[in-house]
Amino acid sequence: MEIIIISGRSGAGKSVALRALEDTGYYCVDNIPLDLLPQLTDILSQSQSSVAISLDIRNIPSSANSLEQTLSTLQKHHQIKIIFLEADRATLIRRYSDSRRLHPLSLKDLSLEAAIDEEYRYLEPLIQHANLILDTTHLSTHILAERLREFLRDNSEKELKIIVESFGFKYGIPLDADYVFDVRFLPNPHWDPTLRPMTGLEAPVAEFLNSHTEVNEFIYLTRHYIDTWLPMLEKNNRSYLTIAIGCTGGKHRSVYIAQQLGEYFQAKGKTVQIQHKSLERNKKI
């Protein structure tokens, strides 16, 4: 039986994710204690082929060993995938303020901020097992549902999807990144007044960066690093590999380098999605 476990931070969108999976045809179970999972899956396997189960902080044991043991038992008999939903701290605080709901750990007389931080510590062992980490900070419910459908399609095809994304450090590191490369030490087109309004997707900026040996060397060495370990990552039953390239504002250097890396792996026949987070963010503004 195929089992999708949905977990993540409270307020990150687990209920939306579970509804999206239900619409896709999964039999869904919301918030069952982890200890009851083996018994539940034994019963469901007699009548269901695809099940989605939501786990929140109230139903996850504080012991990492207990979590490991339960997941190991399930994996012996079923195909398990774990989807972990993330969002940045400020977004979670805003969502709780908007909904006027209590955080599950606020019942322990913690402030909302303290409850969010403590929850993250509890959930850390589960993050280590996640097949997909989705940062919902800037995702609408519609896009979140589409990302989940993409994951399920890619999962059925058993092909690793590479996401190469540029970002600006001043906006924060993407929470869903598997690898983060900092390119702030490279020559910056920002200091050229004619290049400043442009982006790393435009020819004059690309020509400026391509003219510097250190930029080309960085791209070559980064490609070589990923090429070296990609075969092992593909064998590791992953569905997504997210590579984040960051510069100060996410407008010039990171955009150019992310585009170069993404196009390189596309040319090698890999399934690649190129995203420019800070450019998309500024478009919305």
From Swiss-Prot:
InterPro entries: P-loop_NTPase, RapZ-like, RapZ-like_N, RapZ_C. ATP binds at G8, R9, S10, G11, A12, G13, K14, S15. Transmembrane segments: none annotated. It holds the Pfam family RapZ-like_N. Keywords: ATP-binding, GTP-binding, Nucleotide-binding. The keyword Transferase does not apply. Coiled coil: none annotated. GO terms for molecular function: ATP binding; GTP binding. GTP binds at D56, I57, R58, N59. SUPFAM superfamilies: P-loop containing nucleoside triphosphate hydrolases (SSF52540). Belongs to the RapZ-like family. Displays ATPase and GTPase activities. NCBIfam families: PRK05416.1. This is Nucleotide-binding protein NTHI1314.
